[in-house]
Amino acid sequence: DATAVHVVLRNRLGMPVATGRLLQHAPGEGRIGRMAVERALRSGGWGRQVLRALEDAARARGDQRVLLQAQVQARAFYERAGYHVHGEPWMEAGIPHIAMQRAL
C-alpha cells in the first residue's frame, strides 16, 4: 500500500521480530494494524517500540487520533500505552476483538 507506514524491527541477526502498520483512516485520524511480535520475544518491549514509532509517524503527518482493533487478550498492552476501549467487543475468526483509540 503506497500510503501505509510499515515498521519492522529486527534482532541483531537481522531477523524481523516485530511489525506494525499505519494507514490513514480519515483526515486527522490514523489506523494502526497488523501489530505482531515474535511469540518468544513478547513482553520484551518490542511491541511498545513498534507502537511508539507508528504513533510518531501519525503525529508527523498531522493526525490527532489513532484507532486500532485488537484481540481482547492484548487490551492491557494498549491500555498501558494510553488507549481506551471504544464500543462493544465482537468475534472475528472465533477470537474476541475490541476497538480502541488514543488521542495524540
Predicted features and spans:
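A conserved beta-turn-beta hairpin within the catalytic core of GNAT-like acetyltransferases
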Residues: Q24-G33, R42-S43, E92-P96
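Conserved short alpha-helix immediately C-terminal to the canonical SAM/SAH-binding motif I
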Residues: V50, A74-F77
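Conserved catalytic-core motifs of GNAT/GCN5-like acyltransferases
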Residues: L67-Q69, E79, H84-Q101
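Conserved beta-strand in the GNAT
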Residues: V8, M15-L23, R31-A36
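Conserved acetyl-CoA-binding loop-helix of GNAT-fold acetyltransferases
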Residues: V37, S43-D56
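Conserved GNAT acetyl-CoA-binding A-motif
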Residues: L51, A57-Q71
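Short loop/turn motifs at secondary-structure junctions and domain boundaries
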Residues: D1-A2
